[in-house]
Design a protein with these regions (language model features):
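TPR-repeat structural position
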Residues: 21, 55-56, 101
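Residues that mark the junctions of alpha-helical repeat units in TPR/alpha-solenoid scaffolds
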Residues: 4, 11, 38, 77-80, ...
């Protein structure tokens, strides 16, 4: 089962590289036939939707990634960031682009707890401090 899921993920990357976006999406969705959705597949779907600037759809897939659990006990190749940090930081971007700054801030704080020194987290902190004019600690005053 895990080999089939992993094959779907690799096939999706190959299809996307060849410019076959729909086939890439199909390969990712096919992985759901073998077991519950993996964070890796959900993050890839979210990334593809962000690339198309479909931020609401991207947010859906990143939210699914956050609610999924890694299949570590099955011997699967697990990218741990796909179950916490990556969906959180990408949800911050999605909600900011959708104009929902309160949710964007929420996911920024979540990503900040996971990797406070990550360059993207630090950049987002500076962005929010400038954009929303809030103190470095606590919630932005504009929210």
């Amino acid at each position: 089962m895990e080999n089939k899921i992993d094959a779907c993920l690799h096939l999706a990357l190959c299809q996307e590289h060849l410019g076959h976006t729909e086939k890439a999406v199909e390969a990712l969705l096919k992985s759901f036939l073998y077991d519950s959705p993996r964070g890796e597949a959900c993050c890839e779907l979210g990334r593809m939707k962000m690339k198309e600037e479909k931020y609401r759809e991207a947010a859906y897939w990143y939210t699914q990634a956050l609610s999924s659990r890694p299949a570590e006990q099955t011997g699967a190749f697990v990218r741990k960031d796909c179950y916490g940090f990556l969906p959180s930081i990408q949800l911050c971007v999605c909600y900011d682009r959708l104009g929902d700054h309160r949710r964007a801030w929420h996911y920024h704080l979540k990503s900040q707890k996971l990797k406070p020194e990550h360059p993207s987290v630090r950049q987002n902190q500076t962005y929010f401090e400038h954009k929303l004019k809030h103190p470095a600690e606590g919630q932005p005053s504009a929210l």
